[in-house]
Design a protein with these regions (language model features):
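Terminal targeting signals and extreme-terminal segments of soluble enzymes
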Residues: 1-76, 82-143
């Protein structure tokens, strides 16, 4: 597996379910968040910058739900950086069912980096471009 992609495993529990016995749509946001934090933990070049008073702030999220996840399903959340631009970046996620390999959901999250002291967006140039550029994965080349 490409070291630029992190894997987080999640077991579906009862509190994740809605009245129909499926994972509630809002809980997928938590699964994706777990994936992003695992990604930051695995990439010190990202974590070091965030530790210096910069926050990763979600500005857009798109989720494509493909298959219902139910109680006791084991899910794999794959997370990678798919694009960085001048002021924003995109994180890609794939959630698959571990047993069957079926795609459960795919998501893209657009984010900005925010200086927590000034409240201003931090441009993704200079040191940030050097940190994040090598982490970008071309998902069109993925399976």
């Amino acid at each position: 597996m490409d070291s630029r992609i992190t894997i987080t495993e999640v077991r579906v529990r009862g509190f994740h379910l809605d009245g129909y016995g499926h994972v509630n749509h809002a809980r997928y946001l938590e699964f994706l968040e777990e994936g992003r934090w695992a990604y930051v933990d695995a990439h010190p070049e990202f974590a070091d910058g965030l530790a210096r008073g910069v926050a990763l702030v979600a500005v857009n999220l798109n989720i494509d739900y493909r298959r219902a996840a139910v109680m006791n399903d084991d899910l794999k959340v794959e997370t990678c950086l798919t694009r960085i631009g001048g002021r924003s970046g995109v994180v890609g996620h794939r959630i698959t069912h571990i047993g069957s390999g079926e795609l459960v959901a795919a998501a893209t999250l657009t984010f900005v980096l925010l200086d927590q002291q000034s409240g201003q967006v931090v441009p993704m140039e200079g040191a940030w471009a050097e940190r994040l550029g090598p982490l970008v994965v071309d998902v069109s080349e993925e399976k």
